[in-house]
Curated annotation (Swiss-Prot):
Family: Belongs to the camello family.
Function as written in the Swiss-Prot or TrEMBL entry: Probable acetyltransferase. May act as a transcription factor that regulates the expression of coproporphyrinogen oxidase by binding to a promoter regulatory element.
Keywords annotated in UniProt: Activator, Acyltransferase, DNA-binding, Membrane, Transcription, Transcription regulation, Transferase, Transmembrane, Transmembrane helix
GO cellular component: membrane; nucleus
EC number: 2.3.1.-
High-level lineage: Eukaryota, Metazoa, Chordata, Craniata, Vertebrata
Record's protein name: Probable N-acetyltransferase 14
């Protein structure tokens, strides 16, 4: 499917359930890899070992003392990702959310934007997900181009000194990171825990 066969418009009320399922599916595709990445870092392994050692004095089962900290840590990572990316965002100053629609009317992607925290930060992508059945067909790039156009228009209307777009990407989503780098974005830090990055932030001056 060529990008020219796609259109982007605001999400309709009756499309909310479909879009929400798409967001949840997108998070599920990466949450296990992010959890594995986070929990195999040396500081995390030390903390898990210390927690297991402490639980051995409380729990009668050695296996339970070993597995319980891992289970709780994985659950915390997954719940954090689902809360951040697996739900519909409230309407923001940039409008939306928007959906990518094929010529046949099938919704195949979703995008949401929000203003940056401080003046000059530009706009941020808060949701970007493509249905697994429509990936590698130009949907992500079409949504990204739409986001850039919205960010430029918003910056001009607000009198911002520059137009800028920031896209957060889970560390395990290598395909998205490669697409952004191919579109001229640069990785600039991110956030995580214990000194290790779980989400990278890519930015581009427009």
């Amino acid at each position: 499917m060529a990008p020219s066969h796609l259109s982007v418009r605001e999400m309709r009320e009756d499309e909310k359930p479909l879009v929400l399922e798409m967001l949840k599916a997108g998070v599920k595709d990466t949450e296990n890899r992010v959890a594995l990445h986070a929990l195999t870092r040396p500081p995390a392994l030390l903390l898990l070992a210390a927690a297991s050692s402490g639980l051995r004095f409380v729990l009668a089962s050695f296996a339970l003392a070993l597995l319980l900290p891992v289970f709780l840590a994985v659950a915390a990572v997954k719940l954090g990702l689902r809360a951040r990316w697996g739900s519909l965002p409230p309407p923001g100053g940039l409008g939306g959310p928007w959906v990518a629609v094929r010529g046949s009317g099938d919704v195949c992607g979703v995008l949401a934007l929000a203003p940056g925290t401080n003046a000059g930060d530009g706009a941020r992508v808060t949701r970007l997900s493509v249905s697994r059945w429509h990936r590698r067909r130009g949907v992500g790039r079409r949504l990204l181009a739409f986001a850039e156009a919205r960010a430029r228009a918003w910056a001009g209307g607000m009198g911002e000194p520059r137009a800028r777009l920031v896209v957060p990407v889970a560390v395990a989503a290598w395909g998205v990171g490669g697409m952004l780098e191919g579109c001229g974005y640069q990785a600039e830090g991110g956030w995580g825990c214990l000194g290790y990055t779980l989400v990278r932030e890519f930015s581009k001056d427009l």
